[in-house]
Amino acid sequence: MKKVIVTSTWGAGYPEGGGMQWLNLHYLAGLQALGFEAFWLDLLGAPKKGSKHSLDEMVDVFRAQCEQFGLGEHWAVVYDNRKTFGMTEHLLQSLCGDAVLLINLCGALKDNDLLRRFQNRAYFDLDPGFTQIWAHEWDMGLSQHNLFFTVGLNVGQPDFSIPVRGIEWQTFLPPIALEYWPAQSAACAANFTTIGQWRGQYAVWQDEMYGPKSDEFLRFVGLPQKTTQPIELALLIHETETDDLAALRGNGWRLVNPHQAASGRDGFRSYVQQSRAEFSVAKHGYVKTRSGWLSDRTVCYLASGRPVLVQDTGLGRHLSTGEGLLTFTTLEEAARGIESINADYASHSVAARKLAEQNLAAPKVLQSILERAGVR
């Protein structure tokens, strides 16, 4: 059985981040469904000062999650580039040499000794726009890879605003393991919701700033004033962001802590499935570059039969929008999108699930990636 390794830097170190856990698990499930031996390699840095979790706790939670998901012993954690959990260093080196493909999410694996052992090393860009800007500024390890994939469906196209420096980025949609995300009844679903971080990375290209999600949310801060539909944001936003918190609450946004409302893999799934629909902006950098980005969180809503209303990143060139998946560019369009979903919720719900089944099913997405990587 052919082996494929999927990497991360968030598996063990961020147990509260259920969405990040699901991100990797969807790739792994898709590979397993296609008959591959799938391994999860997590690169864990030294815990930050004041961390709530000890090293042993983080590894134990990660181990239990892998076992619950059916990975058995197909996992490893490399701590601070030195200590290995889950398998010996020698076994990990041997596995890297045997694997037919490395799926290196966000370039998580940087160890050249391990990288050079792989037959095929695929860099997976999950931050389109930012990645291409940063590649102009410093060594991101792209040269250590021979394959390049991005969730930015417009990357490299004429309307994508950042030069790609000769890299042949191949595009793909975020995969989802549909068997773990059955369509849900809308009987108890009241709120439009989303889950995410308020702040994030910035990048500068030709003296112009490309910013995080907060920049875009503040453009649409008045939306709750234009609808009777409750909108709840499970956002990591620091208590010192007093002006932003006041603006959000003052305009009627409901705010909850994602580490309480949607913590861990099961908590994240429950929160998504108990929502009526998703409403979310995108990071300013995704919008400004016209990246064609679709969130790996959004696909969880779609698979659950939850319609989504998300900010336009140029996605409509590649996916049909208007039923189940709706996009907006202005405050007025966002308000109309909410009205449209609520006016015919059942149809939008069915369309959301259908879109996921037809375009996002993990085996289908991974099969296309593997074929383009030359892996059969």
Protein language model regions, located:
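Conserved catalytic-core segment of nucleotide-activated headgroup transferases in glycan assembly
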Residues: 156-277, 285
